[in-house]
Every structure is written in structure tokens, then in C-alpha cells.
């Protein structure tokens, strides 16, 4: 439900739409984005590689 400025409530979606769900998609992730589930010791090389590709420009100097 959503409230209009006059205080009336309107239906945005119907009951069938509210019960509907999206299917779970099994999408393959690149190895860099895959979640590591094991507790083995690994080098920090993969983390550093991902950090090197991170965009850091916040454009704070522009107006």
C-alpha cells in the first residue's frame, strides 16, 4: 500500500504479484568474485589483485 497526499491508500500491486517470487539463478561467478568457503591458508595475492582493479576516483575536486 502507498499513501497519496490526500491520505487515501492505493494498491500498487495485487495479491498475486506480491506472492510471486523470482527463480533462484545459478550464475557462474569469475574466480575473483567467488566466495571462499574453505579455511585453508591462501596467499593474499588474489585480494591484492582485486584491490588493484578497484576504482578509487571519488571526483571530490569537481564542482
UniProtKB/Swiss-Prot annotation:
Task: Tell me which Gene Ontology terms the entry assigns under biological process.
Answer: cell division; inflorescence development; miRNA transcription; phyllome development; pollen maturation; protein ubiquitination
Summarize induction of expression.
Answer: Regulated by epigenetic histone methylation on H3K9me in a KYP and CMT3-dependent manner.
The UniProt record lists the keyword S-adenosyl-L-methionine: no
What are the record keywords, sorted? Cell cycle, Cell division, Developmental protein, Mitosis, Nucleus, Ubl conjugation pathway
Any one cellular component term from GO for this entry?
A: anaphase-promoting complex
Record's compositionally biased regions (Basic and acidic residues): 53-63
Question: Could you tell me the superkingdom of the organism this chain comes from?
Answer: Eukaryota
Q: Where does this protein have coiled-coil stretches?
A: none
Matches recorded under InterPro entries: Apc13
Give me the ranges of the annotated region Disordered.
36-63
Q: Where in the cell is it found?
A: Nucleus
Q: What is its main location?
A: nucleus
* Family designation: Belongs to the APC13 family.
Q: What does this protein do?
A: Component of the anaphase promoting complex/cyclosome (APC/C), a cell cycle-regulated E3 ubiquitin ligase that controls progression through mitosis and the G1 phase of the cell cycle. The APC/C complex acts by mediating ubiquitination and subsequent degradation of target proteins. Regulates global growth and development, including phyllotaxis and apical dominance. Required for pollen maturation. Promotes (pri) miRNA transcription of each MIR159 genes.
Q: What is this protein called?
A: Anaphase-promoting complex subunit 13
> What gene is behind this protein?
APC13
Amino acid at each position: 500500500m502507498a499513501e497519496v497526499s490526500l491520505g487515501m491508500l492505493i494498491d500498487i500491486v495485487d495479491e498475486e504479484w506480491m506472492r510471486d517470487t523470482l527463480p533462484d539463478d545459478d550464475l557462474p561467478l569469475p574466480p575473483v568474485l567467488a566466495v571462499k568457503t574453505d579455511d585453508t591458508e591462501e596467499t593474499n595475492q588474489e585480494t591484492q589483485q582485486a584491490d588493484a582493479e578497484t576504482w578509487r576516483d571519488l571526483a571530490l575536486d569537481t564542482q
